[in-house]
Amino acid sequence: MDRRSEAFKIPVPEVIPAGQILSTIEVSSHRTLFDFFKQIRSDDNGLYAAQFDVLLGTYCNTLTLVRFLELGLSVSCVCTKFPELNYVNDGTIQFEVQQPMIARDGPHPVDQPTHTYMMKHIEQRSLSAAFAIAAEALGLIGGTTLDGTQISSSLRVRAIQQLARNVQTVLDSFERGTADQLLRVLLEKAPPLTLLAPLQIYRDEGRLASRVNRAVLVSELKRRVIEDTFFLTKHERNRKELVVARLAELVNCTAPSVAVTRMTHSDTKGRPVDGVVVTTAGVRQRLLQGILTLEDMAADVPVTYGEMMITGTNLVTALVMGKAVRNLDDVAHHLLGMQRDQVRANEKLIKDYEDVPSTARVRADLVLVGDRLVFLEALEKRVYQATNVPYPLVGNLDLTFIIPLGIFKPATDRYSRHAGSFTPTPGQPDPRTYPPQTVYFFNKDGNLVQLSFDSAAGTVCHSSFLDVDSVLVAIRREPHELHCAFGAYVTLPPAGTLLDQMRRFFERWHMLMPARPRWTAEALMTIDQLLSPGNANLRLELHPAFDFFVAPADVVIPGPFDMPNVMPTVMAMPRLINGNIPLPLCPVEFRDSRGFELSVDRHRLNPATVLAVRGAFRDANYPMVFYILEAVIHGSERTFCALARLIIQCIVSYWRNTHQVAFVNNFYMIMYINAYLGNGELPEECTAIYRDLLEHVQALRRLVAEYTVPGEAVGGQGHDALNNVLLDPALLPPLIWDCDPILHRADMGRARAQELWVDGVDYAAIPWVEMAEVNFGNTGGHLVHNRPIRGENKRNPIVPHHDPEWSVLSKIYYYAVVPAFSRGNCCTMGVRYDRVYPLVQTVVIPDLGAEEIAPTSPSDPRHPLNPRHLVPNTLNILFHNARVAVDTDALLLLQEVVTNMAERTTPVLATAAPDAGTATAVTQEMRTFDGTLHHGILMMAYQRNDETLLEGTFFYPAPVNALFACPEHLGALPGLNAEVLEAARDVPPVPHFFGGNYYATVRQPVAQHAVQSRADENTLTYALMAGYFKLGPIALSHQFATGFHPGFAFTVVRQDRFLTENILFAEKASESYFMGQLQVNRHEAVGGVNFVLTQPRANVDLGVGFTAAYAAAALRTPVTDMGNLPQNLYLTRGTIPMLDGDADAYLRRVVNTGNRLGPQGPRPIFGQLMPATPAGVAHGQAAVCEFIVTPVSADLNYFRRPCNPRGRSAGPVYACDGEADAVDVMYDHTQGDPAYPSRATVNPWASQRNSYGDRLYNGKYNLNGASPVYSPCFRFFTPTEVEAKGRNMTQLIADVGASVAPSTSNTEIQFKRPHGSTDLVEDPCSLFQEAYPLLSSTDTALLRTPHIGEIGADEGHFAQYLIRDESPLKGCFPRI
């Protein structure tokens, strides 16, 4: 038979009636293909190859459509066969829609019918698959390699079978691919329910006309994201009606199709189907179990097709009205492509089925949602099972959570609804009144985990905490005005005595302070005032550990006494200690609460001690003669011992007169009294007070050791000195009587670059001065060291009288104990020794015979205090006026003071560089300047009625620090005008040659803390001592490890990923789906032939609105562990190292030891530093927690609702239409936060441009750790990310809110899912620029309630707090 001349015909198999037309077509198609393989008998392989291509294309076309028509997904589309689809370049379809009208009464214009013409693009797609036939199999199938044996015949059958299996696999891929492609097409045009449903409510005549409407819409979107996400998981157990309501909203929020088609999917009773709901198998099963009612289990599905006509170049007009297939004639002609003569051969059989309806009954789940009958379809198993293609309706949802750590609640919120609900151990204080340091929450498995301050060591115990160089460079580009230089300028004292220097300072004070300094105003502000948009100085509050201030530029500090007229600039100084954090950001209540915590189970002053010492500090009649005695003793142990009898009589007299203790303003005197007068020389009660006072100072010293981890010295200093500034030799006591602190300070080494100016010149020590050598008018750099008790040789080297611990205790006493009792009502004073020593020599002592006994009663004429001996201007008068009973023997001892005299009160200015714990290339040039008085005194309560004091006869004010700068004491300097006295009430009158506020170690916040505190003296001493703990990385590592609250809090940010199960709803006939002619391409290859099958597809939406919508219905599983893995910047970030190599190595070691993100092995020379891989994982991918330093006084309510971790709202969605508005919303703090208009921010250390948090997490600065890979904070701090997401949100609202207006046929409207709308169900935190609060608490008791299923009945208990879950996960984890 000559097959070359015979036309090829597709064999037509016998049609077997089976009651199901679709199944019949499928069976007949399979037989056709198999019969073709059986009939191949020829040597002409080319002929049969062409016949095979044609047959394969027809076969795939047929069964692809047949299988698809069995799916409920076919409800949503109109299938159209379009063989010429390959030739279409730019297809469009035109719709005409007539808008409905309402006839109205009244003076309304009469409406006319309106027609809208829409043009829509055809989107072209394709499906492809491939298989191969080996050369040997081709030979067997073609018969070229047959040898007539049974073996070759068997091999030929096996080859045909294998080919059939390959073709079946390809066919199966086209069947699955058709369903997958259409599902993705529907998803591409389906906006989330959380967007589509609110738009129907808030759209004003089809448009969002104003910013107000847009803001209202955004607020609603936020609410709907929280409520609608995972609605099935949340409510399927208890509130099933809410699930039904959400489903009804889903199927009713879409617009119907414009296709007026005769094809109708219906249930077995003939009710038309309105659409299809596609979801996962799990959600489908849960919906059918008690939530939705199954209306029917089968459906009548029409076998449909469409016809395409090409008219004009690149213009396609679709006849979208489906044509029902009435009989198998149409099946054969349009689906199998049979020739007419082949159809006539079966004419008799076909006529038997002419009356069969055009529908086929298939298995289906039909449910009623509201009043709409829909298919409920799950393609997960039918289409996607065992494939490597993910199911499109299983998605990912990224959520960012926020957890406040260490926030201190204001007094109004520190309450307990039932104080007895959580009671401490009997007899013990309630730890729930302490500032919180730990936060507890649940991980994905319901296990309780925690984060503490120690978890943040990897963030702040890093040298990036000290990197402010780039910040200075950036803010110096901005214009600044120097309103007041006082506090920001340091000079050396001018020539002359200290008294003259003080007078000159007050004469020129107004030049330095034309306005009120910023640092004094801030100390009196509330947190709301500091963070208000009207605070112009808020822009300089950028870092918790640095003060930024405007100062004179190009002036080397210390500068000239008269500040030069230069341009201003911005300077930065380390705050050094947490007590220097501004009071609004670290309030007095917090400091006192922390002090109370530290005082528990530690030494506390006896109430009698408190009363006696407090009374002395507040005694306005404190004997002036006591200050005279202090001055002549001037810290000399030798002189004290010589005057011991006189001192005893002074103490005893004052004790008996007032029941108060004398000399408590002088640490040296307290030490000597305890050492020499504590063995019965004084009344027992009085001795106990001095002893108790000293024990308290020593307890404060032990406090530092308790909060310091022992270790080897770093940079030549012990860790306790690196942890607390009072143990740092660089800081001198405010008053020194000898050179001991200076000598100990000199042992620090050159790294601290310490310098010392004594009266403006270099320092030099003098052993001691006797009366013959004294010069009260002496100036210069000489300091008297005091005469030692032993070894009196002026030629001997000058060595300290006491060990370094003496100086440490001295600083603790002056900086912690004295302010607690004085509350700012004390002042360091200069002494006029030129008048004191002559006064001492004026004592009148009656002559007594050799055999006479000295009288003890002042009534005796021989007693020195008898009225006949009270000569004016003598020392006797001072003792008499103070009612101090001294005898002759005691007064005779005063002659010993001339053997070791003081000449003057000398100002000392000491400077030092940062210690090894804070020294970097940036901070090494920053110097502190602290003033000290040598041979001065500390005067307690000012004696307004003492004439000698008012005239400045013996003492004059010389404040060295704001702690010792009572304005009332300026009355001892006659001649000051009223302006100076008034200014001193607002600004501490500390001369600029004693340092400046911003350059001092102890600054205004500490002084104001002592003044404003309402705590008792015990608590306040510990509170002040806590304020002197340093803010450097090494110091913080000690504090975190030992449980010390550092004075600031953290905002913890964590990002988790969840697998979601989504629901898609599509209206019936809402998509036109075109199928082109399948093409088979052969590619000869070595060893066989490759076949590539490609079929062009296209689709176009048939709606004038959104015809599909979807929602995240159920939570499948968390991918991440929702745990507590802290970030470690040593793994992700490179920055400036510490200057001291030992300090850098120490930090790396203590941070990385035990850290789960510690580096793996030694640091590689090349390549990336990777974390150590754990041996096992139990809870999933670890989610990293990042820490944003936050003021401890931040509004806790801010964290109870979704909020921006920066502390201020961001994103163009809040902005106006101006180009700069989006940037201003993020960074312009002169405007209120859009979410909280009364304040600019809740965290100035993170929300402002160039702030610490901004520099740490903003990818704009090209830091390798600030990336979306490592950092969950990246998306909130990087402006490009914020703007991109904000533009998505703005465009999303504009696109979705646009209505269909009357338009010409040239207008193209594509109702596709707006760009960025997927973020509503995939990444809402980036879209809204908000993180969600997670269920967390600082107290585990608040997470435990007596009722099953009830968590967090109370939101607070004293200082502890509970944050409720306000995220989309709320209600998804019942066990939590």
Swiss-Prot record:
UniProt family annotation: Belongs to the herpesviridae major capsid protein family.
Record InterPro entries: Herpes_MCP, Herpes_MCP_upper_sf
SUPFAM superfamilies according to UniProt: Major capsid protein VP5 (SSF103417)
Location of this chain's protein in the cell: Virion; Host nucleus
Domain of life of the organism encoding this protein: Viruses
GO molecular function term, any single one: structural molecule activity
Subunit and partners: Homomultimer. Makes the hexons and eleven out of twelve pentons. Interacts with triplex proteins 1/TRX1 and 2/TRX2; adjacent capsomers are linked together in groups of three by triplexes, heterotrimeric complexes composed of one molecule of TRX1 and two molecules of TRX2. Interacts with scaffold protein; this interaction allows efficient MCP transport to the host nucleus. Interacts with capsid vertex component 2/CVC2. Interacts with the small capsomere-interacting protein/SCP.
Transcription regulation among keywords: no
Gene: MCP
UniProt-recorded name of the protein: Major capsid protein
